[in-house]
Amino acid sequence: MLVTLAGYDILRGRRLLTETNASDFAHLIVACLFHDIGYVRGILNGDSADGYIVDAKGNKAKLPRGSSDAALLPYHVDRSKLFVMDRLSKIELLDATRVANAIEFTRFPPSHGADDSDSEEGMLVRAADLIGQLGDPHYLRKANALYYEFEEVGMNKQLGYASPADLTDLYPQFYWSSISAHIQSAIRYLNVTSSGRQWIANLYSNIFRAERELSLCGPQR
């Protein structure tokens, strides 16, 4: 929900700076709402006890016993796009392909095909995804849960995290090296409204707290 709220505030700012119509609002908000639906098991017609659909060819991934929805992290973007194409294609006022293309931009690290120059809409959905997560006032408190989600698919090792404390210790570096460049256009739109500036303040507050190693706001360090 925070991602959708961030997307809405980005659109509010954009509307004050450039032409933004009802269709723009609808497609971006719907993309924000459905961008992570692929984590949910059983949403696609081919999902079954034998495995979960992971691509348009119908290939499946069988999850180990005891897995959570987080185990679908490597596939969730493709699953979200498949869900959108299946469920939204019959809605006249929405272009399912447009929504799916915007969701593609939420793949992280960004896919090579997701060129910011081709789709401002996709870039703003990506920014809403990042800002909604990292601008959460409780983001650092959620570090333990996030770490174990990463651990379930081995991503903690890829990112160099050996414990939840590493996630917060390395957060400022991660933000400036991997996040900041992808959200600058959205920051420009957020800076136009008071609610948008609150998102910016939240982002920098989390960086400040991680840098200062404030107690009681995240994993024991």
Q: Where are the regions that the model predicts?
A:
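Histidine- and acidic-residue-rich, metal-dependent catalytic cores
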Residues: 7, 70-111
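Divalent metal-dependent phosphate-bond-processing catalytic cores, especially two-metal-ion Mg2+/Mn2+ enzymes
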Residues: 9-24, 34, 38-45, 88-93, ...
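Alpha-helical context
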Residues: 10-13, 56-64, 79, 122
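Post-HEXXH active-site segment of zinc metalloproteases
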Residues: 43-67
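Active-site alpha-helix of zinc metalloproteases
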Residues: 27-31
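Short acidic, glycine/Ser/Thr-rich loop/turn "cap" segments at secondary-structure junctions
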Residues: 15, 58-72, 84
